[in-house]
Amino acid sequence: MKNMLLMSGSKYQNTDYLVHTLPWLQDFLADYQGKTVAFVPYAGVRQSYDEYELKVQKALAELNVAILSVHRAEKHAEIIEKADVIAIGGGNTFCLLKGMYEHHLLPLIREKVQSGTPYFGWSAGANVAGRSIMTTNDMPITYPPSFDALNLFPHQLNPHFISGKPAGHNGESREERLAEFLIVNPTANVYALPEGTALHIQGQQARVLGQHDVLLFSENMQLATLPVNSVFDY
């Protein structure tokens, strides 16, 4: 049974890196004390993979799991194959997906998660769990072979969702960008995750976690609100 924790981002308000996720992860990894977590760092553009791995190790030290970045092996897939848990970090979603294609990780991760290996990711790491990365907020600074992602959650995700426009901003709002996507892709569903929220997916159900409701946008920008702690079939 699929068991995934898809988190909007690594911070909430003024909290330090990944601090607000620790209660969720403590529950999520309760049965994996002392186990190995394969970490995929490809989204980290402004830091080396070594630096990214260390940053996550320090942030999650109290969880009593071994964080091992896939770049530590010549064949990155080997670490995924042996891992008890899979984690994918945030950053640039295009770089992340390109790296996953280059190292042939998508079918392997998909198979392992469908077979029950826990998966958690934040920001870009949540985005790639969905059908495609077409609703990321990131600049396309590189070009993956396809926008198709893991499709473990067979819908679109939009992490870091914020409604409306900041004062003085004259570009498109997030709602306007998602409206554009739904005009071109009218059969899609987009789950918008505000900061401080997550989806805990178990099998074919998902629970909303965090401080805010999750929003579901569908054709013609129909809006459904998914309250905190609600459970829905997807």
From Swiss-Prot:
<dbReference type="GO" id="GO:0006508">
    <property type="term" value="P:proteolysis"/>
</dbReference>
<keyword id="KW-0720">Serine protease</keyword>
<keyword id="KW-0224">Dipeptidase</keyword>
<feature type="active site" description="Charge relay system">
    <location>
        <position position="160"/>
    </location>
</feature>
<dbReference type="InterPro" id="IPR029062">
    <property type="entry name" value="Class_I_gatase-like"/>
</dbReference>
<keyword id="KW-0645">Protease</keyword>
<dbReference type="GO" id="GO:0005737">
    <property type="term" value="C:cytoplasm"/>
</dbReference>
<comment type="similarity">
    <text>Belongs to the peptidase S51 family.</text>
</comment>
<dbReference type="Pfam" id="PF03575">
    <property type="entry name" value="Peptidase_S51"/>
</dbReference>
<dbReference type="InterPro" id="IPR023172">
    <property type="entry name" value="Peptidase_S51_dipeptidase-E"/>
</dbReference>
<comment type="function">
    <text>Hydrolyzes dipeptides containing N-terminal aspartate residues. May play a role in allowing the cell to use peptide aspartate to spare carbon otherwise required for the synthesis of the aspartate family of amino acids.</text>
</comment>
<dbReference type="GO" id="GO:0016805">
    <property type="term" value="F:dipeptidase activity"/>
</dbReference>
<dbReference type="GO" id="GO:0008236">
    <property type="term" value="F:serine-type peptidase activity"/>
</dbReference>
<dbReference type="InterPro" id="IPR005320">
    <property type="entry name" value="Peptidase_S51"/>
</dbReference>
<keyword id="KW-0963">Cytoplasm</keyword>
<protein>
    <recommendedName>
        <fullName>Peptidase E</fullName>
        <ecNumber>3.4.13.21</ecNumber>
    </recommendedName>
</protein>
<feature type="active site" description="Charge relay system">
    <location>
        <position position="138"/>
    </location>
</feature>
<keyword id="KW-0378">Hydrolase</keyword>
<feature type="active site" description="Charge relay system">
    <location>
        <position position="123"/>
    </location>
</feature>
